[in-house]
Every structure is written in structure tokens, then in C-alpha cells.
Curated annotation (Swiss-Prot):
Reaction(s) the record says it catalyses: tRNA(Ser) + L-serine + ATP = L-seryl-tRNA(Ser) + AMP + diphosphate + H(+); tRNA(Sec) + L-serine + ATP = L-seryl-tRNA(Sec) + AMP + diphosphate + H(+)
Gene name in the database record: serS
Documented EC number(s): 6.1.1.11
GO biological process, one term: selenocysteine biosynthetic process
Binding site for L-serine: 231-233, 285, 384
Natural source organism: Acinetobacter baylyi (strain ATCC 33305 / BD413 / ADP1)
Free-text domain note: Consists of two distinct domains, a catalytic core and a N-terminal extension that is involved in tRNA binding.
Protein name, UniProt field: Serine--tRNA ligase
Length: 423
């Protein structure tokens, strides 16, 4: 959530920043809400002052032996008016908060203008796509030929956009996960975390999925309001909800491996073949909690950690700076990493790394205690390090051989019992 003071006092600056997203707020509406809020707050405070003065007057009259019944009757009426004014003020503040929760984060000044992915800016490329001297297969054909990737079985078990991995491919996915976690925890300084795969609505409000994106979530039926996590970002970032952290503890850095569950609402007909777009997929997520002045440098570091995984695996990729119109709801700046997929002859997203600024922290009331003993909002960051299923398909396609076997990248061989290939 963006700073309410900006909405109250500088809506023009908010709209100027949101223009990069193609979003504009109605200044008249927000001015009207602020006028009503001030009127109700002033009325409430005035009535409270009148009640306090009346109580003092009653005490003086009774002390003098006089009759204070008339004033006491008026005070009772004032009490009823105060209750009504407080209810009206609370309802208005709830309305303002709900409207504020639907406003996306303000893009950083360095974010380019643009409407969609066509306006994103390529920052760099790493690696050279392999030139094959045989007719290549996509990962779906490779997996089915090996007998280790089954979509029909998953459809029978659950439905479309699910998959079953068996044998060497299942082991390769586990190897990728272990390699990612080992790299982030042993080399990059993250603390490993395993978290619940079900979260409550407060957690999803904290990270920004609710209330705006409920249709993208899987919600459980029953008495308790639980949702399947769309990413480990949700539970891990909420570690600091309603907390005040000592400054010397920052930054906090966590890495978590979880399945992720997404309804993929609005993606009907897109990427229906293979592992690109699934309702359930594994991901290793990185989360950092930092001081405000450190967050932009932390974004570069976190993105570099995701790049390091791709480089260690020898997978060609490119780094993209997202334009305002393509950024996620809660982000102030985002880099996407796109891996080369030979069968599609293009790059596809494999990691998204975002600085959320204080947007999530304000929703969560996540603060830290400064050296001056004041409390300020932390900044939060998150990034995929990496999406495991998409990394698996990238390894399968980029490391395939003419005989259908798949070479095992050197860094994964210790996790594969020394195997140099699988078939």
C-alpha cells in the first residue's frame, strides 16, 4: 500500500508516478474523501472535548451541592453522538483503506515507461544459444520418450495443467532444487526455510495478492479461510508482519523451496503444452528484508544470485528491465530473467526479481528500530531462484543429444550419483 499521506496531500505526484503504469486516480474523489474524513474527525474531537468539559463542570456543580442533571442529560446525548461519529469515521476510513489497497505501487524513477512486455528494456545477455546439428525435440517429446514426464496420468489424477515426473527426470528435478538451495544458503548467505503451503487472508493481504487478485488463487472450502500459496514469497515475507526488528539484524535473507499453486485465470489457451504454465509447480524463492536505503542495491544482489544459478548451469539467458505497464502490482522495480528455450527459438521467463519498497511493509506493519530508536518501515524484496520446472525443461532442451539422452550439467552431477547423462 502506498503512503496514505501522499493520497491525502499530493495526489498529483501519485498520478504522475502511476502514469508509467497507465493508471490514474480521480483527484476529485480522493479530495472528497479527505474532506469527509476531516469533517468527521473534527466533529468527533469537538464532541469529545465538549464531553470532557461537561464532566469537569458536573464535578464542580456536585462539589458545590448543586443540581447537574441537565448537564448530565446533555452529556448522555453527546455520548450517543460520539459513538455515531466514531462509527461513521471508522466506516469511512475502512472505505478509504479498501480503495488504497487496490492502488498499485509507484514505479521507481529508473523504470521505463511502457504499456506491456513489448516496451521492456533488455539490459544484458549471457551465453550463446547452442547450434544443434540434428532435429531437436521439445521437452515434452523428450520426457515422453524417456518415460519420465506424463501429462495424461496427471490429467487422470487431477486435470489439465498438471504433470507427473518419474525416474531420472524426477531425480534431476530434485538435483536442481538441492543445487539451488545449497548455492543460496552456503554461498549467497540465505537462511533456508520450510513454510506452510496454506496461508490465511491476512498473509495474502500483506504481500498484495488480496483483495485485488483473489481469482488467481486456490481457496480451500471449509470453516477456516485458507489459501494455497501462489509463491513462497507470501509466507516468508510475512515472517516480519507486525514485527519491529532491531536494525543490526538487517538484512534478513531467506531461501525457501515450495510448490506454488496458481489458477492461471486469464491464460486460457496460452502455453497449454508442456511445463511452461502449470497450476502447480516447484520454485526456490529468495526473500530479503532490508533498510530502505539498501533496497536498490539489494535488488541488484538478489538478481545476481538468480543469474548465478543460470550461469552455473550453462543456460543462456537475458536480463530484462520491466516497463511500468508490465510490472507486478506491488513492485517498484523488477528485473526478469529469461532463459533460452531451443524448441521455441526464444527466451522465456524463468525468474522475476522485484524490489517492493515499503509497499508490502506498510500493509504488514513490518518495521525496524533505527539507531535513533525510531521505528520505520522496512523494504522487502523477492525473486525466483529459480522456477524449478522451467529450469528442468531448459536443461532438457539445451542439453539434449541426438539419441534422445540428456547430458547432466557438471554442477548437478554430484547430486545425480555422478551420472553424466540420463535416458
Amino acid at each position: 500500500m502506498i503512503d496514505p499521506k501522499l493520497l491525502r496531500n499530493n495526489i498529483e505526484a501519485v498520478n504522475l508516478a502511476l502514469a508509467k503504469r497507465g493508471v490514474q486516480l480521480d483527484p476529485t474523489e480522493w479530495a472528497s474523501l479527505e474532506v469527509r474524513r476531516k469533517e468527521l474527525q473534527s466533529k468527533t474531537e469537538s464532541l469529545q472535548a465538549e464531553r470532557n468539559a461537561g464532566a469537569k463542570q458536573v464535578g464542580q456543580i456536585k462539589k458545590a451541592g448543586g443540581d447537574a442533571s441537565e448537564i448530565m442529560t446533555r452529556m448522555q446525548a453527546i455520548g450517543d453522538e460520539i459513538k455515531a461519529a466514531e462509527v461513521a469515521l471508522a466506516e469511512l476510513q475502512a472505505e478509504i483503506e479498501q480503495k488504497a489497497l487496490s492502488i498499485p505501487n509507484l514505479p521507481d524513477e529508473s523504470v521505463p515507461e511502457g504499456k506491456d512486455e513489448n516496451d521492456n528494456v533488455e539490459i544484458s545477455k549471457w551465453g550463446t544459444p547452442r547450434q544443434f546439428d540434428f532435429e531437436i525435440k521439445d521437452h515434452t517429446d523428450l520426457g515422453e520418450w524417456m518415460g519420465g514426464l506424463e501429462f495424461e496420468t496427471a490429467t487422470k489424477l487431477t486435470g489439465s495443467r498438471f504433470s507427473v515426473l518419474k525416474g531420472p527426470l524426477a531425480r534431476l528435478q530434485r538435483a536442481l532444487t538441492q543445487f539451488m538451495l545449497d548455492t543460496h544458503t552456503l554461498k549467497n548467505g540465505y537462511t533456508e526455510a520450510y513454510v506452510p503451503y496454506l496461508v490465511n487472508a491476512d498473509s495474502l493481504r500483506g504481500t498484495g495478492q488480496l483483495p485485488k487478485f483473489e481469482e488467481d488463487l486456490f481457496k480451500l472450502q471449509g470453516e477456516k479461510e485458507y489459501y494455497l500459496i501462489p509463491t513462497a514469497e507470501v509466507p516468508v515475507t510475512n515472517f516480519v508482519r507486525d514485527e519491529i526488528i532491531d536494525a543490526e539484524r538487517l538484512p534478513l535473507k531467506y531461501a525457501a523451496h515450495t510448490p506454488c499453486f496458481r489458477s492461471e485465470a486469464g491464460s486460457y489457451g496460452r502455453d497449454t503444452r508442456g511445463l511452461i504454465r502449470q497450476h502447480q509447480f516447484d520454485k526456490v524463492e529468495m526473500v530479503q528484508i532490508v533498510k530502505p536505503e539498501d533496497s536498490m542495491q539489494a535488488l541488484e544482489e538478489l538478481t545476481g544470485h538468480a543469474e548465478g544459478i543460470l550461469q552455473a548451469l550453462g543456460l543462456p539467458y537475458r536480463k530484462i528491465l520491466l516497463c511500468g505497464g508490465d510490472m507486478g502490482f506491488g513492485s517498484t522495480k523488477t528485473y526478469d530473467l529469461e532463459v533460452w528455450v531451443p524448441s521455441q527459438n526464444t527466451y522465456r521467463e524463468i525468474s522475476s526479481c522485484s524490489n517492493m519498497g515499503d509497499f508490502q511493509a506498510r500493509r504488514m506493519m513490518a518495521r525496524y528500530r533505527t539507531d535513533q530508536k525510531k521505528t520505520e518501515l522496512v523494504h522487502t524484496l523477492n525473486g525466483s531462484g529459480l522456477a524449478v520446472g522451467r529450469t528442468l525443461l531448459a536443461v532438457m532442451e539445451n542439453y539434449q543429444r541426438a539419441d534422445g539422452a540428456i547430458e547432466v550439467p557438471e554442477v548437478l552431477r554430484p547430486y545425480m550419483g555422478g551420472a553424466t547423462y540420463i535416458d
